[in-house]
Design a protein with these regions (language model features):
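Conserved C-terminal helix/tail region of periplasmic/extracytoplasmic solute-binding proteins
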Residues: 128-143
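Secondary-structure end/capping motifs
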Residues: 58-128
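Pocket-lining segment of extracytoplasmic ligand-binding domains
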Residues: 1-89
Length: 143
């Protein structure tokens, strides 16, 4: 059990986005890091922030969306300061340094190509969800 049984007012929560960087400034403490837990369980990267295209739109649309996203990501990775200035528009009060830290937590080699480990991570997450009857079993096409 997480939290403090002696203090029912103390409630655990899942922090996402910039909360991962700023939680201590708000007097919060980390009980568990889900990314670390996932890696301990699977030895795989945690599958976050994926772009999904509905297959029924057809392969031409799927291919064009993938091309456009890849081009955009490549531009951002080749122009990091410009991309960071753009990200600051959505930074929800973060400093430039905190925004840089947050962006670089997630912009990495997996951003351009999640590889075999990334594919296994997605399939593992979906399998676990289906095993627990949270989601139906599904076939996934990863391009």
């Amino acid at each position: 059990m997480y939290g403090n049984p002696g203090n029912p007012g103390l409630q655990p929560a899942v922090l996402i986005h910039e909360g991962q960087i700023t939680y201590e400034r708000h007097g919060l403490r980390k009980i568990m890091d889900l990314g670390e837990w996932w890696f301990e369980q699977t030895k795989l990267p945690i599958p976050l922030g994926l772009d999904v295209v509905k297959a029924s739109l057809g392969m031409d649309v799927v291919t064009e969306v993938k091309r456009a996203l890849t081009e955009s990501l490549r531009y951002a990775m080749n122009n990091p300061e410009e991309a960071l200035r753009h990200a600051m528009e959505f930074a929800r009060g973060l400093s430039l340094e905190d925004t840089r830290r947050f962006v670089y937590m997630y912009v990495n080699d997996y951003t351009m190509d999640m590889g075999v480990d990334g594919e296994r991570a997605i399939k593992t997450l979906l399998e676990w969800g289906a095993d627990e009857r949270i989601i139906p079993r599904t076939q996934v096409l990863i391009l």
